[in-house]
Amino acid sequence: MDIKRIILYVIVALLAIALFNAWQRDYPPTPKPTPTVEQPTANGDHPTAYTPPAFTPGAAEKTKKAGTIALTSKVPEARLITVRTDVLDVEIDTQGGNIVSAKLPKYPVSLEEKQTPVQILSGEPNELYVAQSGLTNGNGQPTTVQFESAKKQYVLENGQNQLIVQLTGRAPDGLLVTKTYTFHRDDYAIHLAYQVKNNTSKPWQGSLYTQITRRQPPTEHHHFYVRSYNGASMGSPQTPYEKLSYESLDKQNIDRTSQSGWIAMQQHYFLSAWVPGNPELTYHYYSHVIPASGEPNVYVVGFVSPQMNVAAGSEAATHATLYVGPEIAKRLKGLAPGLERTIDYGWLWPISMLLFWILSAVHAVVKNWGWSIIITTILIKIVFYWFSAKSFRSMARMREMQPRIQALKERHGDDRQALSRATMELYRKEKINPLGGCLPMLIQVPVFIAFYYVIIESVQLRQAPFIFWIHDLSVKDPYYILPIIMGLSMLAQQWLSPTSPDPTQQKMMWILPVIFTVFFINFPAGLVLYWITNNVVQTLQQWYVNKTYESHKAKLKARRARKRKR
């Protein structure tokens, strides 16, 4: 076995370990929340799970961060309106007209619980996560409105492509407020429209605010299991995508203005995001942390629109969009620039996007994500064949030099400097690059990392079956068959390589496949499938290069002879 192959395997292993360590530090897991005890108020009633934020006069926009929220009980059933479409199950609280629950019926929590949908938004105090919106007055104070609706239940029926939920109410200052949510078939974007009628005798000034309020999930550490980013993020024309971790929000609140943009809360595969209605206007983005004694803090992120001026007897309208659903690039890209970056493909994002595009194109034909991974991997290996062949031939030439290098070692003995000079002179004379076997292989490492992120982060692979016992490519093989096959594929590569006379390298030939097999046991099945395919194709390529090496060397020698004659 060639020492350069050992070095390459070690580098790949270290890169993989570094990836895991980085994810464990930055994106800790989300365990189940611990229960809390509800405390009644003085009159025996439980306060609501939240109230609209208290805005105070600020700088330019006269708006500032959110105020306090009551967090001890859920919204009473009597105040809830339910909305059901083909992709969303939503609950709206008539006090404020906020969305306090959102479930995704097309995304079950697990293959074992297919009837239980993933829930993004929740009004439960222990896992508070709601999408709020409302109006502020000229002083930046929120206007609390008790809304009414024509029905308690709204359902998008067969044949309907649009569902409108209209809420009406009167604000304390006399404004007639109409809040309208519009849902569309096969769409996770919810369009929000506010209409304000000023029936008073005085002009009214105010703004629209939208925000996401979420209690931070408790954190604990797991090893060798990938977790994605969980926290806030925002985008603007200046910075298309910016992560705002809970730790960073603890240290400093958001307080900035931006034309258009968006703000979101992310978790693995899913997110919620508010997008301003008019990309030409400038909005004020803010955040606020609400300390909770003995419990995780609550985080508020949102934006406020420019101020509206409504004369007496006049009316005005404003709007925004709420997205609650899976992180699917084509859906997010159409809502706001940079929102698709919430698919956390890491620092090799452009390469990952290209690989996912290829993967999706293959899937459109074969209709199976497992076979798509195999075919895409084969295509990648074909593209990089020149680099692989160059690496294999370089290693073959280095093996040919081993007897001459051994002779140099015997000649120079313990004189390491003389041995080094003689070895480099031999390489120069034979026109051999000592790193020629490693560099072409290392060029492929970024593609491996990018494909790693594609398989880990793409919601399309969540609960995607392959064949036989592999029912979910996004989790580990339950029977560890794929990691064992991967280890065997590595052994096949080693057997194809000439055996080294060095006993240490011979041991490494057997140890490395075992180490990698154990290391990959908890990797998602899709990633192990990629690695198996990569090994098999590379083994076939190496076999072909070795078989044609002598003829290739003869052709190269003849070509050099012709050049010398010229």
UniProtKB/Swiss-Prot annotation:
One of its GO terms (molecular function) is membrane insertase activity. GO terms for cellular component: plasma membrane. Gene3D superfamilies: 2.70.98.90. It is a multi-pass membrane protein. The chain crosses the membrane at residues 3-23, 346-366, 369-389, 436-456, 509-529. It comes from the Bacteria. GO terms for biological process: protein insertion into membrane; protein transport. Its main location: membrane. InterPro entries: Membr_insert_YidC, Membr_insert_YidC_N, YidC/ALB3/OXA1/COX18, YidC/Oxa/ALB_C, YidC_ALB_C, YidC_periplasmic_sf. The keyword Transmembrane helix applies. It is found in: Cell inner membrane. Keywords: Cell inner membrane, Cell membrane, Chaperone, Membrane, Protein transport, Transmembrane, Transmembrane helix, Transport. The keyword Protease does not apply. Belongs to the OXA1/ALB3/YidC family. Type 1 subfamily. PANTHER family: CYTOCHROME C OXIDASE ASSEMBLY PROTEIN COX18, MITOCHONDRIAL (PTHR12428:SF65), OXA1 (PTHR12428). Interacts with the Sec translocase complex via SecD. Specifically interacts with transmembrane segments of nascent integral membrane proteins during membrane integration. This is Membrane protein insertase YidC.
